[in-house]
């Protein structure tokens, strides 16, 4: 692989992907594969921060119809992201690479509190930084968290890992005529209503001029391929 396109990025990983072929929980082979991909990508000379969802363990929006308030449900979901980050941290460190989990919540017995200074320091030290706890506030998705944290730590792009190789005009699994876009502007992504990322995340990325690269995580090495400019995906920028 050649020189990396970006030197500091935030990678957004779906919590559901952590479950592997299961409908719930953490699939260790999947976590191990992701850890290996992150380490390989870091070896390209890229400083890597990761935001992980919590949908493999808990989805706050789904319990709001069952008597749990949306703020409480979202908080439970954000705590699920901490568990995912700790599992990924352990998988990375088993490979003799340093990782640190920083949380939006104060939980000193578990992990450090996220601050910009701590994130900058650990990235400069060559550690993979795992950003847990969402924004720390209800009603915001982990997609929005990824864009927010990218702005805070000076990342050059957000890499949004999905189960398809970019943004399509329709669901390619349901519509074989769906068109894949090589590039979209932030405004086009918002106006098109594409479901690959929520509108708040796209709007914040537009406001901060932050590129988002949507790609498939299904194959090993896909993160490194995107970072080296050889991967297949959709660039949302401009």
UniProtKB/Swiss-Prot annotation:
One cellular component term from this protein's GO annotations in UniProt: cytosol
Regulation: Inhibited by UTP.
Record pathway: Pyrimidine metabolism; CTP biosynthesis via de novo pathway; UDP from UMP (UMPK route): step 1/1
Places the protein is found: Cytoplasm
Binding site for ATP: 12-15, 55, 59, 162-163, 168, 171
Protein name: Uridylate kinase
Species in which this protein is naturally found: Rhodopseudomonas palustris (strain BisB18)
Keywords from the named record: ATP-binding, Cytoplasm, Kinase, Nucleotide-binding, Pyrimidine biosynthesis, Transferase
Reactions catalysed, as given in the entry: UMP + ATP = UDP + ADP
Enzyme Commission number, as recorded: 2.7.4.22
One GO biological process term: 'de novo' CTP biosynthetic process
Record GO terms (molecular function): ATP binding; UMP kinase activity
InterPro entries for this protein: AceGlu_kinase-like_sf, Asp/Glu/Uridylate_kinase, Uridylate_kinase, Uridylate_kinase_bac
HAMAP family from the UniProt entry: PyrH_B
């Amino acid at each position: 692989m050649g020189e990396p396109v970006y030197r500091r990025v935030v990678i957004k990983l779906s919590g559901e992907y952590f479950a592997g072929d299961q409908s719930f929980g953490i699939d260790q082979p999947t976590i191990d594969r992701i850890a290996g991909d992150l380490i390989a990508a870091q070896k390209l000379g890229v400083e890597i921060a990761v935001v992980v969802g919590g949908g493999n363990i808990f989805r706050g929006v789904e319990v709001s119809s069952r008597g749990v308030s949306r703020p409480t449900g979202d908080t439970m979901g954000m705590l699920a992201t901490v568990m995912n980050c700790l599992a990924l941290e352990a998988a990375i460190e088993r490979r003799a690479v340093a990782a640190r989990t920083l949380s939006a919540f104060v939980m000193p017995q578990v992990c450090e509190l996220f601050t910009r200074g701590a994130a900058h320091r650990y990235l400069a030290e060559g550690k993979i930084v795992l950003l847990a706890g969402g924004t720390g506030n209800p009603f915001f998705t982990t997609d929005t968290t990824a864009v927010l944290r990218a702005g805070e730590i000076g990342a050059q792009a957000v890499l949004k890992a999905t189960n398809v190789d970019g943004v399509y005009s329709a669901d390619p699994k349901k519509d074989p005529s769906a068109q894949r876009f090589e590039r979209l502007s932030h405004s086009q992504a918002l106006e098109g209503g594409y479901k690959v990322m929520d509108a708040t995340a796209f709007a914040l990325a537009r406001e901060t001029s932050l590129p988002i690269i949507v790609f498939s995580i299904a194959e090993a090495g896909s993160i490194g391929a995107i970072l080296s400019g050889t991967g297949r995906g959709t660039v949302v920028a401009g």
